[in-house]
């Protein structure tokens, strides 16, 4: 019994899961995920609505983007469309000043994500002139979401799954590297990108099974507010996966990623790249 208990204790120490849990508490992971959802709904969603309304291919606009991400179909997708569909003249009634303000708010969302990555990797806060990184990241994010929706209507089956996996992996591999100015090496960011892809796939499956009927139920009970609450809950899940995946990636890199001699900085922690 003592030998078995000793082995379990050594296995627990080797896994170092307690350190991952501690990191999550220090980062206030759930609190950050809720902040991610709030900013996404308040700053990112209006910008995406305007961008989707300008879609020359006219494939459903912003609601189709949201339905695709949540894995909704049928009645739940129609209810979501009723709540989030903008008026047809949204582009004509949106002034240049309004679009500029939406862009500024969208960049603030990118800044929030950048700050979270800096906290996860324990790096100093980026200087104000790095706002161009946040803006560029936002543009790439919108391009990523756009291609996800467009390929969803033209590519099916294994090809769609493969394309989604590759583009999502690239985005979550490139995104932290770019926002952090190259201060963390590519190889150290790979585990976090993989964890984010797996987490989003699991969230999509959960959303299809749970949120699909929940949207219908909430719409009947609470109307449009019920639908927005479900979307907010899903966005909290997305934030948890995005930040949790990056946090898992750093933990895995430090405790289970075998570094090369060049990467070891002498204190047992993964090496860092040059700042940029």
Describe the residue ranges of each PLM region:
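Membrane-embedded alpha-helices and immediately adjacent juxtamembrane helical segments
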Residues: 1-276
């Amino acid at each position: 019994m003592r030998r078995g208990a000793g082995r379990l204790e050594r296995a627990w120490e080797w896994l170092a899961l307690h350190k991952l849990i501690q990191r999550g508490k220090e980062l206030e992971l759930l609190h950050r995920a809720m902040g991610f959802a709030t900013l996404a709904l308040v700053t990112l969603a209006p910008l995406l609505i305007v961008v989707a309304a300008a879609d020359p291919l006219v494939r459903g606009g912003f609601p189709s983007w949201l339905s695709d991400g949540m894995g909704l179909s049928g009645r739940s997708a129609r209810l979501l469309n009723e709540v989030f569909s903008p008026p047809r003249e949204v582009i004509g009634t949106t002034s240049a000043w309004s679009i500029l303000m939406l862009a500024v708010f969208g960049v603030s969302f990118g800044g929030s994500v950048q700050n979270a990555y800096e906290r996860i990797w324990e790096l100093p806060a980026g200087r104000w002139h790095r706002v161009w990184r946040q803006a560029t990241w936002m543009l790439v994010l919108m391009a990523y979401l756009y291609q996800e929706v467009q390929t969803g209507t033209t590519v099916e089956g294994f090809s769609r799954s493969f394309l989604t996996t590759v583009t999502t992996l690239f985005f979550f591999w490139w995104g932290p590297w770019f926002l952090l100015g190259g201060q963390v090496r590519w190889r150290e960011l790979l585990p976090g990108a993989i964890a984010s892809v797996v987490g989003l796939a699991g969230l999509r499956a959960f959303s299809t099974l749970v949120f699909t009927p929940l949207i219908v139920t909430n719409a009947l009970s609470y109307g449009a507010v019920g639908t927005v609450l479900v979307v907010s809950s899903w966005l909290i899940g997305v934030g948890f996966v995005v930040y949790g995946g990056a946090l898992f990636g750093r933990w895995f890199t430090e405790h289970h990623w075998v570094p090369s001699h060049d990467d070891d900085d002498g204190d047992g922690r993964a090496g860092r790249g040059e700042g940029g």
